[in-house]
A protein has these predicted regions:
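Acidic surface patches and DE-rich sequence motifs
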Residues: 33, 312, 344-345
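Beta-strand-turn-beta hairpins that frame and shape the catalytic cleft
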Residues: 205-210, 315-318, 335
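Short, surface-exposed beta-strand/loop micro-motifs that present aromatic residues
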Residues: 348-350
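Phosphate-binding active sites in nucleotide-utilizing proteins
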Residues: 209-280, 287
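Cysteine-nucleophile active-site neighborhood
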Residues: 252-331
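Short, Gly/Ser/Thr-enriched beta-strand-loop segments that form substrate-interacting elements
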Residues: 337-345
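RNA-binding accessory domains that recognize and position tRNA/RNA substrates
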Residues: 2-236, 258
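Conserved beta-strand segments of alpha/beta enzyme cores
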Residues: 140, 231-233, 295, 320, ...
């Protein structure tokens, strides 16, 4: 593979108006990609090394929501906005499973890769700093990385696996000498789905019931359905939802390759023979497509941001959408009687 390519530490960190002696850590760390590229930085958060798939997200805000999004399971999340952590982490209600400001009950990303970590935070609803939260959840991070250079490499070469190696972590050598972890090689859906049905009531008598097939569902989906006057029956990814009573079925978002969840595809295929409406979001869309006879494929670097433009096929109408997935539906594989409804305006994918 040749000598490793070493990218310099981000100069933006050195020139920041934030005093470097107030930053949380002097621990040396580096991000190592499978193509040999190496990015030097400093560790923060939990003191552990980790391996996974390196991806990037281009949103300017929303790091608590992104970190807790189950679609990031097994991934080292790179945030392209240069200053992260300045508004802290929202307060959490232990009695509310649908906490606003979070997409699940825990951080799902393997690690966080950023340019600058804000040493201070300020927000009326903040209860802790970003670093304190990462430590509590056992999630490592690295700052001082030139995230623009890293993003360009991922954009131009496709998503790569990588290792975050922290010099002082007790597991550094073990992670450094182990194969790169690839979430696409296993069924990560089973790792993030609920394990038994959960009924969320909206409080309206006679409300419609939506069956939410949880393949890694974000809590904002449940909150949105409840706000629209629907009861939500959340069921595990491999649950036989066809036998459940309900007015519609929503196939949730989630992590990984849709082809690693054949049980869900089989259930959807049986449901398509009925008359009940089915809808899919991100991974759910891909699972629905597989059940209908389409093929799916891995995108070069995925769609991960709050500003993905989608065009309704056959019209000039465009919606700006929030997306987080690394796979897409192959529109050229459409079976008879099916056609694409929306495509991504950036790359034409479904």
């Amino acid at each position: 593979m040749g000598d490793p390519i070493v990218e310099p530490r981000s100069s933006a960190l050195e020139s920041s108006s934030l005093s470097s002696d107030r930053l949380s850590s002097k621990r040396a760390a580096h991000l190592e990609l499978e193509d040999g590229t190496r990015y030097e930085g400093r560790a923060f958060g939990a003191n552990r090394s980790i391996s996974g798939e390196v991806v990037f997200a281009t949103g300017m805000v929303g790091y608590p929501e992104s970190l807790t999004d189950p679609s990031y399971r097994g991934q080292l999340l790179t945030l392209t906005y240069p200053l992260i952590g300045n508004y802290g982490v929202p307060a959490r209600n232990a009695d509310d499973p649908l906490n606003p400001g979070f997409e699940s009950s825990r951080i799902q990303a393997q690690a966080l890769v950023i340019q600058n970590l804000s040493p201070d935070y300020s927000h009326w609803n903040a209860s802790s700093s970003l670093e304190q939260w990462l430590i509590e959840e056992g999630i490592p991070g690295v700052q001082g990385i030139d995230v623009r250079a890293l993003t360009r490499r991922l954009r131009d070469n496709g998503t790569l696996r990588g290792r975050l190696l922290i010099d002082e972590s007790p597991d550094r050598d073990e992670v450094a000498n182990s194969p790169y972890q690839d979430p696409g090689s296993r069924n990560v859906v089973a790792e993030v789905s609920c394990t038994e049905p959960i009924l969320h009531r909206c409080g309206n008598e006679g409300a419609v019931r939506v069956i939410l097939v949880d393949c890694g569902a974000k809590t904002s989906i449940v909150r949105s359905l409840i706000a629209r006057g629907a009861d939500v029956l959340q069921v595990p990814w491999d649950h036989d939802f066809v036998a459940e009573a309900g007015d519609a079925v929503l196939l949730s978002n989630g992590p990984g390759d849709p082809k690693n969840a054949p049980e869900t595809v089989d259930n959807i295929r049986r449901a398509l023979a009925g008359s009940r409406p089915l809808m899919g979001i991100c991974l759910g869309n891909q699972l629905l497509a597989l059940a209908a006879g389409f093929d799916t494929y891995k995108l070069d670097f995925g769609h991960r941001s709050q500003n993905q433009p989608c065009v309704e096929v056959g019209t000039a109408r465009c919606w700006v959408t929030s997306q987080n997935h690394g796979y897409a539906v192959d529109g050229t594989s459409a079976p008879e009687g099916w056609e694409e409804w929306f495509i991504n305006a950036n790359d034409g994918s479904n």
